[in-house]
């Protein structure tokens, strides 16, 4: 079951929390299955921060069905677990942010990103930080590249 909060305003954004009730009816699930997701909306643009959600009990698929099309996705669980293709097909994010180094990202996640035409993926390991800025033309991605010194 996927519980959601009522939307509320914060600054110029409208926020809605998803997965707000603990999943207690599945005995063998990890804490990531109880992770919150936040949908942030402003001027018709939609960003989903999917936390550490996993799809062990179908939450990601239900979340995608409840939310529909988004502009950007913070890939859940650091990209270590696959996002079901069914969920990616519903969400259809143009931009994906992965909070992990590329070497740690699941092959299934990489295939999902690469198989979707037009999706751009950014990894925080390649950047000192990633910022999404809302512009009149859409979302702008800013990255601070950290150079690694070699010995």
Where on the chain are the PLM-derived regions?
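Cap/insert and terminal regions of metallo-dependent hydrolase folds
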Residues: 58-131
């Amino acid at each position: 079951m996927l519980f959601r909060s009522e939307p509320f305003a914060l600054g110029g954004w409208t926020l809605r929390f998803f997965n707000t009730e603990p999943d207690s009816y599945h005995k063998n699930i990890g804490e990531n299955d109880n992770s919150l997701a936040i949908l942030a909306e402003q001027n018709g643009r939609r960003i989903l921060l999917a936390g550490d959600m996993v799809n062990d009990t179908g939450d990601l698929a239900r979340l995608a069905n409840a939310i529909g099309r988004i502009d950007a996705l913070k890939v859940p669980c650091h990209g270590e677990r696959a996002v079901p293709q069914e969920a990616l097909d519903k969400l259809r994010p143009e931009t994906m942010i992965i909070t992990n180094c590329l070497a740690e990202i699941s092959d299934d996640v990489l295939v999902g990103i690469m198989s979707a035409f037009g999706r751009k993926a950014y990894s925080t390991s390649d950047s000192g930080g990633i910022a999404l800025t809302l512009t009149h033309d859409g979302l702008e991605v800013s990255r601070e590249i950290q150079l690694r010194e070699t010995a």
